[in-house]
Amino acid sequence: MLTINLLLAVGALFWIYFLWSRRRLYFLMLKIPGPIGLPILGSSLENIITYKRKLSFRTKYLNKYGSTILTWMGPVPFIVTRDPKVVEDIFSSPDCHNKSQHIVNAITSCMGNGLLGKQDPHWLDRRKHFNPSFKQDLLLSFFHIFDAETKVLMNLLDTYVDKGEIDVVPEMLRWSFKIAAQTTMGSEVKHDEHFKNGSLVESFESLISHSTLNILMPLVQNRMISKICGYDKLRADNFSRIQKMLDNVVNKKVNPLPKTDSDPESNIVINRAMELYRKGDITYMDVKSECCIMIAAGYDTSALTVYHALFLLANHPEHQEAVFEELNGVFPDAGHFGITYPDMQKLDYLERVIKETLRLIPAIPITARETKNDVRLSNGVLIPKGVVIGIDMFHTHRNPEVWGPDADNFNPDNFLAENMEQKHPYAYIPFARGKRNCIGSKYAMMSSKFALCRILRNYKISTSTLYKDLVYVDNMTMKLAEYPRLKLQRRG
């Protein structure tokens, strides 16, 4: 009995010391409103119970406490904001370049340590090295890939015409994966069997889901717990399948034929990574990790952006008809018509539709930054060093204080120049902002617009599912609890 009492006393003393050592943190953090949660656990239990509905979890507290709130993950503070002014403070601060280390660990444990996982001071040099892979002249050289793979997609969609409502998401994912793999790794990847049969889409989807699980339920990152639950084997099996494709292509790059600067593939991701490998700056495994992460980041978001745009237009036929009229004016002949960059620049209405889609259903629902030093926000609040701040894109884009009482409604006219002039520049952040914004934002817009040109010019889209009935799932990338089926009818 004495031993138990002694242990309890020692434990209590350690807990008091722990709280006392963090008194400045608590003093500063408790100035921010938000749910206190349970003792010791904070809001962790509610997070675990509602981890598939965390968007509604954040909606509830942002509406209750204001646009910047404090939650507690156990003893760890986590700030969430939808306030454009605070978003600007974070994205523009040199002390907020680092991503949350917890999220970085969750992703790199599944996909390796690429650009996405780099922190200060290393991320900037790596980012500069890969910037040429996303310059416009290189993106324009990808048009033949967009064209070929979109033709394959259209041939598949043709088989669904007048067949009732069908699930188009798997086809969208395969279409986008094949484009992302080729634009990341070059034409050699087309000869890989896993690429040809599209089986790697499921493996990448599994890794993305596993990364999300690591983020939302940190205990799963423990190797023993992961093994007991079977997640470790599942991750290893899927990663192994992806590695085989990566090895097949990367091995051919170790001793390549000389390339000239005029070679259109000289600046693609794999070749930029191989430059670092030959200099001894990164390992062979790092080359594969860069390719793996770039493919994963590129294909999932582009595919679902196209799908979400189709679904929203199916729910708003007047806007779909306006898009069709615009497309018909630029591409009078249906079928497999050619698309050039000047053609795409004429499509102002379609551009606004894509932007409005990304406002309502952003590809990434939330991103997180960790303060490297104390950061003073424009509202006067001081955020201590080491605190994680979640920039909630989903709720920033639906903030009624910025977008008005109809913030949840689909309206492409939100992006008319005269309407955007009235908005805070950080009110719309689908690809983040600042020095560490999304490196592939132009690629995502270009590939999505290309596919939507062909699909919406050739088909009328409808659905029996209402937009208001969508259930959003908080994932590493935006997901829906269920993907409504779409009906395709041919246009002339």
From Swiss-Prot:
It holds the Pfam family p450. Its main location: endoplasmic reticulum. Its cofactor is heme. CDD domains: CYP313-like (cd11057). Keywords: Endoplasmic reticulum, Heme, Iron, Membrane, Metal-binding, Microsome, Monooxygenase, Oxidoreductase. One of its GO terms (cellular component) is endoplasmic reticulum membrane. Heme binds at C438. Its EC number is 1.14.-.-. It is an enzyme of class 1 (oxidoreductase). Coiled coil: none annotated. It is found in: Endoplasmic reticulum membrane; Microsome membrane. GO terms for molecular function: heme binding; iron ion binding; monooxygenase activity; oxidoreductase activity, acting on paired donors, with incorporation or reduction of molecular oxygen. It is a peripheral membrane protein. May be involved in the metabolism of insect hormones and in the breakdown of synthetic insecticides. Belongs to the cytochrome P450 family. This is Probable cytochrome P450 313a1. It comes from Drosophila melanogaster (Fruit fly).
